Amino acid sequence: MNSEESELKGTGTAEDPYQIGSAAALAEFAPEATTTRAMIVSMLARLEGVESANNAGFADVSNEWYATAVNWAANVGVVNGYEDGTFQPNTAITREQLAAILMNYAAYKGEDVSARADLSSYTNQPSTWAEEAMQWAVAEELITGVTNDELQPQSSATRAQVAAILQRFLAE
């Protein structure tokens, strides 16, 4: 078991959002560290009780500890890979990627994802592909500006940010 996998072991439930895959533990021991794409989808797969999934065809996922979670998330439309056919599971997740994944997950769960916030007051804007997801995440108060005028959508999401965002997301 590698360190990321052991960090995600836990008994989390939706009623105990900080314990989803030990999200609180992630924030407690290294709040400024980044969170990987694999860790995020693994947390969501734990919420869903996913035990198996068909191969989604990512060249870099095969039989790793996160393979079932990534394959499930791709198969149900929660995540997409990169143009080169990879998922890049060990890449730090950005704030806009997290917003997109959570919006897709909310849609998968049948939630209303139509809310949109005006992001024009922020000096840095999300990538075109992530614009609606960031508008939704800000409207739902899941993601807030890092400062009053900086949203920093392309910045890596710290473990502390991820824990707070997941707590707000699961509380809805």
Predicted features and spans:
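Surface-exposed repetitive/solenoidal architectures
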Residues: 1-33, 41-44, 52
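Feature responds to low-complexity, polar/acidic, surface-exposed segments characteristic
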Residues: 31-69, 76-96, 102-131, 144-156, ...
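C-terminal/domain-terminus segments
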Residues: 158-165
